[in-house]
Amino acid sequence: MKFIGKLLVYLLVALLIVILALYILLQTRWGATQVSSWVTVNTDYELSFDKMNHRFSSPSHIILENVTFGRDGKPASLVAKKVDIGLSSRQITDPLHMDTITLFDGTLNLSPQTAPLPFQADRLQLNNMAFNSPNTEWDLSAQKVTGGVSPWQPEAGNVLGNHAQIQMSAGSLTLNGVPATNVLIEGQLNGKEVVLNTIGADMARGSLTGSALRNADGSWIIDTMRLNEIRLQSDKTLTAFFAPLTTIPSLQIGRLDVTDARLQGPDWAVTDLDLSLRNLTLSKGDWQSQEGRLSMNASEFIYGSLHLFDPILNAEFSPQGMALRQFTSRWEGGMVRTSGNWLRDGKALVLDDVAIAGLEYTLPQNWKTLWMAPLPEWLNSVTLQKF
């Protein structure tokens, strides 16, 4: 019996020595190479890292250094200087579901070709990371990203998952060709619905703040949005500039405020624009509104040969049409003032009062052609009540 007892003790000591040796070896470059090779050979993924660290002061955390991870034959999904993996008792029943995963100083590629990833976490934390998501609905590139996704449950075609809370900031970001800096985003992913509770960014030498919702069908609801001191030059015509609004099912605007904006494109420009828009929905080339309002003024507005100085416009929207409360502007050395209504039923513009003073205007050479040109689709007739 004593012999069996001593044998068991020796075996236990030997086992502990082997475990300790493995523990030490795994934290060497040789151990990192062996683990990387095993994952690459025996799974559909490629993994490489230089070193694994573990400290008894943080027994539930494993740190990998200089990590590259991705699917076989595909671009790497993850490149990071350091990956901190937080473990919990959940690994007993679900080994690939971590408590936390923290990525430091690297790049996370969100392309559908790199998904799905085989692991999940209660929280994915990013520190000074870069995002890339080419060839997706949201063509995104971001640098110096810090923030978190909770929970993180990546799926095929959606590396962030379908249900998560998001809090992120980025030093710079380009979304569908639009650049911004000092970006802050807080929101949720609910299936194909995206809730943006807080949006903040510096863009076009100005700033943007607001909150919005993207529905599953691709339509947008803007609760609030404010643009301050935007300075934007575009190579697009005015029609092409607003063309993206026609590509989505609908855009519902609760409140939009623009302050001191300067916009310019080929053959059009507006300077010192102040705009306030309430309760308007754009859909399929038309609009709907219930108690909507528009107030707008600028120092200068140019569209083709039309050149207005100090234009002021105030209007109200309803299901019946638009009530033009005020339009005044300096034009061609004179002053123009009018008010009236545009009626949806019949597409008729009825101007209650039109006043023109001090006008010095020379008709263009093609004025007859312009006079005979058909009216736009939204206008069938014009009536002047008083001139």
Predicted regions and their residues:
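Short small/polar-residue motifs
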Residues: 42, 46-51, 143-155, 180-186, ...
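Short acidic/polar mixed-charge low-complexity motifs
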Residues: 45, 74-76, 136, 204-206, ...
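Terminal hydrophobic membrane-targeting helix
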Residues: 19-112, 175-180
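Short, low-complexity Ser/Thr-rich regulatory SLiMs
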Residues: 56, 87-91, 153, 212-216, ...
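Secondary-structure transition motifs
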Residues: 66-159, 215-251, 263-279, 363-376
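N-terminal Sec-pathway targeting helices
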Residues: 1-17
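Small-residue helix/turn framework positions
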Residues: 61, 66-68, 123-130, 160-189, ...
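Short hydrophobic/aromatic-rich motifs at helix boundaries and adjacent loops
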Residues: 6-10, 22-24, 57-58, 155-158, ...
